[in-house]
């Protein structure tokens, strides 16, 4: 199949599923060759779906009921606060959240890095994860603990330090099989492709695939693209005005500790550029989870949760599990 990829031929869903399983027994050099060849060719929806299905089938299983995930592909190279972690804690005030995350590959603050910087412990086992969910409505599922089959592939990804299909796969491979998902992607064309792949992997009720002018989040300073899936596909664009918010700057973030501090500032009621960034994405997550009727409603729900102290209280609950 490597020659096929080098010739820029696309793989079918079945071939992609088989290739994933084959990579688990390949040398690091050949794994790197396959990943680079796929990335250079450009991954298709069938290839994403085949890899994602195989990754889920190889994962450690965990049943947490009907949950939501807030996750981004990463790989956008940005230096921003970890918005998806902030959003997941806000969302946990209203519904069950199983956040699937990892350490940083291409950014300054991956979700696992920031989660620990917030003073939270990553559950060691599925039993610990279930305990966290039962007590707090929230659990952080550290990708490396649920995908042991990938231990040969992770060092290759770390060494390559470039975007690969695995940047796309992480959010599609949550072992809790979320019914609702807001998923940030690192390029505009991935919105439709990843939405299609998510629908093909199965189990999803509603999802929003978002890309924000260079970010795998909705951007507070420009136009964002969304592909919405709820049994059918709909693609459209939004700006902060659609959320009742003013445009605001994105302030660079240099470390997980800085990201954690700035999230706590917002949770404590500080009104700044980070707040708009978080509110916009939280509103979209609340809409995806069918808690908010639309984006404007989502902003009001998120604001109330912050201003009433619910979000800080939720963070404290999660810290104390």
From Swiss-Prot:
Protein name, entry field: Anthranilate phosphoribosyltransferase
Binding site for 5-phospho-alpha-D-ribose 1-diphosphate: 72, 75-76, 80, 82-85, 99-107, 111
EC id: 2.4.2.18
KW Magnesium (keyword) present: yes
Residue positions binding Mg(2+) 2: 216-217
MF terms in GO: anthranilate phosphoribosyltransferase activity; magnesium ion binding
A GO cellular component entry from the record: cytosol
Keywords: Amino-acid biosynthesis, Aromatic amino acid biosynthesis, Glycosyltransferase, Magnesium, Metal-binding, Transferase, Tryptophan biosynthesis
Family matches, as NCBIfam families: trpD (TIGR01245)
Swiss-Prot/TrEMBL catalytic activity: N-(5-phospho-beta-D-ribosyl)anthranilate + diphosphate = 5-phospho-alpha-D-ribose 1-diphosphate + anthranilate
Leading EC class: transferase
GO terms (BP aspect): L-tryptophan biosynthetic process
Annotated Mg(2+) 1 binding sites: 84, 217
Residues the record lists as binding anthranilate 2: 157
SUPFAM superfamilies noted in UniProt: Nucleoside phosphorylase/phosphoribosyltransferase catalytic domain (SSF52418), Nucleoside phosphorylase/phosphoribosyltransferase N-terminal domain (SSF47648)
Pfam families, alphabetized: Glycos_trans_3N, Glycos_transf_3
Record text on subunit structure and interactions: Homodimer.
Family note: Belongs to the anthranilate phosphoribosyltransferase family.
InterPro entries, per the entry: Anthranilate_Pribosyl_Tfrase, Glycosyl_Trfase_fam3, Glycosyl_Trfase_fam3_N_dom, Glycosyl_Trfase_fam3_N_dom_sf, Nuc_phospho_transferase
Cofactor: how and how many bound: Binds 2 magnesium ions per monomer.
Binding-site residues, anthranilate 1: 72, 102
Pathway this chain belongs to: Amino-acid biosynthesis; L-tryptophan biosynthesis; L-tryptophan from chorismate: step 2/5
Listed cofactors: Mg(2+)
Function: Catalyzes the transfer of the phosphoribosyl group of 5-phosphorylribose-1-pyrophosphate (PRPP) to anthranilate to yield N-(5'-phosphoribosyl)-anthranilate (PRA).
